[in-house]
Amino acid sequence: MTFELLATDGKARRGRLTFPRGVVETPAFMPVGTYGTVKGMLPRDIEAIGAQIILGNTFHLWLRPGTEVIRRHGDLHDFMQWHGPILTDSGGFQVFSLGALRKIREEGVYFASPVDGAKVFMGPEESMRVQRDLGSDVVMIFDECTPYPADEEVARRSMELSLRWAGRSKIAHEGNPAALFGIVQGGMHEDLRLRSLDGLEEIGFDGLAIGGLSVGEPKEEMIRVLDFLPPRLPADKPRYLMGVGKPEDLVEGVRRGIDMFDCVMPTRNARNGHLFVDSGVLKIRNAVHRHDESPLDPACDCHTCKHFSRAYLHHLDKCGEMLGSMLNTIHNLRHYQRLMTGLREAIQQGKLAAFVDTFYARRGLPVPPLT
């Protein structure tokens, strides 16, 4: 993987990631394909909405169907028939989400499989092996996601454990041509975030992610970390904000120098009838749309908006038809990709401030301050 920084506008960055399997223009949003599928989307649909890279879930694919099944097809790209780049998370966040079902030790994490209840172990070496078997283009280190809230002592112990696991991940990754990203932890504590960053830079990674956000903290806390941390990340490496978020969060992340994002929100919200439009959120199951012949968003060029009315999408939602979720997902993911395209063009032209002003004006919201 190579990363080129092509333009800046304030803290915002316009870049390009180049992989053997394709080019990713940044800032970029990665649709989430947890089980080897972006829910409701054929691979050709993912390509059609403009996605250049997707995210796969190491933890879930390891448990089911298992890497031995996937490897018989070649790798995850062959298994799911997506031939662009894939970033795989390490499984650390999913283990974190198990709560009382897992026990964290120095060697790794012991837990009961959510698939069949079997006792399972995953550590840095296992995570790196699974991601190698998946043929990931970007591999994430195995880490512990610091919970929120966490006092300084809890956050410190978690961060230091993640640093030790980062070193083991780097060693276990040797010989794998894929890019390896470190993950900055430390909770909401700036001094711990800096210590994590220093430790990761000493180990050496191809890119750095910000973890431990979007885990229940107030929006103000997330923004505080994003005001503080990205300017301190190395300028010559991609910066990835994990698990975030709403369109507004993407805009605020880009304004602060983030290059890569992922989140289940556009696909999950699509299945619940919450659709993103330039003016905000449209709830398609509301009765007001029953006779509405207009498209979801006249400004959108997705297949859904070009061919179907709000009334039809409302009807599908009320009937529980799977086509409704599919069309909604196409629209939401295209909305996110259109947003990223607009951000890239604005940075390239030195017009990000005007883009941000228009973005918030359409939503009837004030522009948040940028420190």
Swiss-Prot record:
Zn(2+) binds at C300, C302, C305, H331. Signal peptide: none annotated. InterPro entries: ArchSynthase1/Queuine_TRR, TGT, TGT-like_sf, tRNA_ribo_trans-like. It comes from the Bacteria. Its cofactor is Zn(2+). Substrate binds at D89, S90, G91, G92, F93, D143, Q185, G212. It catalyses: 7-aminomethyl-7-carbaguanine + guanosine(34) in tRNA = 7-aminomethyl-7-carbaguanosine(34) in tRNA + guanine. One of its GO terms (cellular component) is cytosol. Its EC number is 2.4.2.29. GO terms for biological process: queuosine biosynthetic process; tRNA wobble guanine modification; tRNA-guanine transglycosylation. Residues 243-249, 267-271 are annotated as: RNA binding. Gene3D superfamilies: Queuine tRNA-ribosyltransferase-like. Binds 1 zinc ion per subunit. Pathway: tRNA modification; tRNA-queuosine biosynthesis. Pfam families: TGT. Belongs to the queuine tRNA-ribosyltransferase family. Homodimer. Within each dimer, one monomer is responsible for RNA recognition and catalysis, while the other monomer binds to the replacement base PreQ1. NCBIfam families: Q_tRNA_tgt, tgt_general. HAMAP family: Q_tRNA_Tgt. Catalyzes the base-exchange of a guanine (G) residue with the queuine precursor 7-aminomethyl-7-deazaguanine (PreQ1) at position 34 (anticodon wobble position) in tRNAs with GU(N) anticodons (tRNA-Asp, -Asn, -His and -Tyr). Catalysis occurs through a double-displacement mechanism. The nucleophile active site attacks the C1' of nucleotide 34 to detach the guanine base from the RNA, forming a covalent enzyme-RNA intermediate. The proton acceptor active site deprotonates the incoming PreQ1, allowing a nucleophilic attack on the C1' of the ribose to form the product. This is Queuine tRNA-ribosyltransferase.
